[in-house]
């Protein structure tokens, strides 16, 4: 399944191509670096994109939990960020996993995420995110 079908991002802002696996508390997505992306420079995508790649894997999980509906989410914090490689090359395919470790039942979640290219660890981090319900979104938007 195409990840873009349940993500709020579109076009060049999508950093998850395909949903590989999704279950209760877990998502796995594939992403290939595009040569024509405005974020690709000299044939590489820098490590600055890694947190967004991880966050979009969480976004895929959120969309799955909301019956395929793309929902707005907020990245609140990143802990234990470990980057093993400074960039990804054009056409490299990475696999991102997101495993939920905490949920408060009100829209606050913590996920342990990892990006791998084959057997190589690229990056990992613990992301705190908020997936607001409709009532909370209305109060945010005024």
Predicted ranges, named:
Residues 1-10:
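Short aromatic-glycine motifs in intrinsically disordered, low-complexity regions
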Residues 4, 16-18, 83-87:
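Beta-strand-rich interaction surfaces with strong enrichment in secreted/lumenal proteins
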Residues 10-46:
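Catalytic strand-loop segment that frames the active site of acyl-thioester-processing enzymes
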Residues 13-15, 94, 109:
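Hydrophobic core residues within well-ordered beta-strands of beta-rich domains
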Residues 20, 84, 99-101, 116:
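Conserved positions in beta-strands of structured domains
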Residues 42-60, 75-76:
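Compact, glycine-rich, soluble single-domain proteins
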Residues 60-97:
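Hydrophobic beta-strand-centered segment that forms part of the acyl-chain substrate-binding groove
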Residues 89-90, 101-142:
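HotDog/MaoC-like acyl-thioester-processing domains
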């Amino acid at each position: 399944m195409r990840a873009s079908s349940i993500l709020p991002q579109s076009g060049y802002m999508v950093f998850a191509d395909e949903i590989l696996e999704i279950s209760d508390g877990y998502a796995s997505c594939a992403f290939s670096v595009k040569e024509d992306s405005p974020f690709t420079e000299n044939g590489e995508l820098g490590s600055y994109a890694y947190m967004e790649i991880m966050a979009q894997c969480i976004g895929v999980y959120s969309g799955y939990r909301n019956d395929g509906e793309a929902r707005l989410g907020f990245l609140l914090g990143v802990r234990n960020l470990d980057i093993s490689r400074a960039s990804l090359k054009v056409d490299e395919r990475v696999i991102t996993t997101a495993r939920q470790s905490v949920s408060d039942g009100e829209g606050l979640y913590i996920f342990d995420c990892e990006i791998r290219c084959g057997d190589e660890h690229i990056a990992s981090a613990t992301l705190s995110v908020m997936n607001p319900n409709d009532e909370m979104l209305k109060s945010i938007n005024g």
